[in-house]
Amino acid sequence: MSSLYTLPGHLIRRLQQIAVALFAARMAEAGLDLTPVQYAALSTIHDNPGVDQATLAGLIAYDRVTLGGVVERLEQKGLVRREVSARDRRAREIRLTEAGDDLLTAALPWVEKVQADIVEALGAEERAVFLSLLSKLTDAGNDRSRAPLRDDRTDPARS
């Protein structure tokens, strides 16, 4: 039987724990109240103004129900607003508020520091290989996820 400490799944889970801890520490250092999924949502809404919740969930690979709670908390904090779509009265579009845009701008340099923290033990060449392999594995396993990423990179119809 393989040692737990050599199993890819265990190591990936540990790295995720470390990444979340680093994110929380950097946000606390910056005095910002933001989680990794909230940052992903704000960043994606910024890049896709008027996105609907189902599309947003696909763009950040999160299940719709959980993301609904995330969007609700962002709305309660005054960081996003949901509006009835002019194209489809049944749909609700999500947009950043000025406060959401300001928070995203303030968080960006700290998020960049977190990313550097995560891979600081690797040299430049190792980082490139590591990120390439992570992308390869996540792309290859995307359809097996309970919340697959849905964007231009993973949509075969757009390739």
Give the predicted meaning of each segment.
Residues 21-66, 147-151:
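N-terminal helix-turn-helix DNA-binding core of bacterial DNA-binding proteins
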Residues 14, 18, 46-47, 62, ...:
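Alpha-helical structural segments
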Residues 1-33, 44, 152, 158-159:
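N-terminal leader segment of winged-helix/HTH proteins
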Residues 9, 13, 17, 61, ...:
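Short amphipathic alpha-helical segments with heptad-repeat character
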Residues 58, 69, 132:
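DNA-binding alpha-helical recognition surfaces that contact promoter or target DNA
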Residues 10, 40, 55, 65, ...:
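Active-site phosphate/pyrophosphate-handling residues
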Residues 127, 140-159:
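Short amphipathic alpha-helical interaction elements located at domain edges
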Residues 50, 72-139, 158:
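Charged, amphipathic alpha-helical coiled-coil/dimerization segments
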